[in-house]
Amino acid sequence: ERLTLSAFTDKDREAYNTLCLDDERNKWWGYDYRTDWKGEDLDSYFLDVVREDFTKKRAINFAIRLDGKCIGEVLLYRFDGKGGAEEGCRIAPEYGGQGYGVEAFRAVAEWGLYQCHLGHVVAKCFKENDASYKMLSSCMRKKGEDEKFFYFNKEV
């Protein structure tokens, strides 16, 4: 495999901030940081949130690394208390379309299921997001849809 997944470090700050501040790319992420941002220093805000979410057991975020460089993020979050979690993934635009998202997404889904013993991992994507639809379809089973999203599931 071409990638490594590991915890974010202070050395990732610039690349991670760029990823988090990319409004065009993040419209597909389904979350706008401005919802929770209270004016904190943006230079440290995003990594601080990652660390706080981990400490409070709300999420496990992994830096996606290519040759040691942070090129994206994959995470498990929204743990449901019944053995399930939701997964999300985003890749910096200059690395998109090369299969990195699929590789990272599959690795974390399998880690969650087979190492952490989750019973299922779910994900969703906007209907207009062809790249995410292809990524999710390659490693999960489509479970349904509504007007806005396609929903996917992976079980042990």
Q: What is each stretch, according to the model?
A:
Residues 1-27, 61-156:
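Acyl-donor (CoA/ACP) binding surface of acyl/acetyltransferases
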Residues 37, 45, 57, 97, ...:
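Intrinsic structural disorder
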Residues 34-38, 60, 128:
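Short, conserved alpha-helical segments within structured domains
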Residues 20, 29, 53-55:
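Hydrophobic residues in alpha-helical segments
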Residues 26-48:
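Conserved GNAT-fold acetyl-CoA-binding loop/helix
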Residues 47-62, 72:
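A short helix-loop-beta-strand connector motif used in the catalytic cores of GNAT acetyltransferases and
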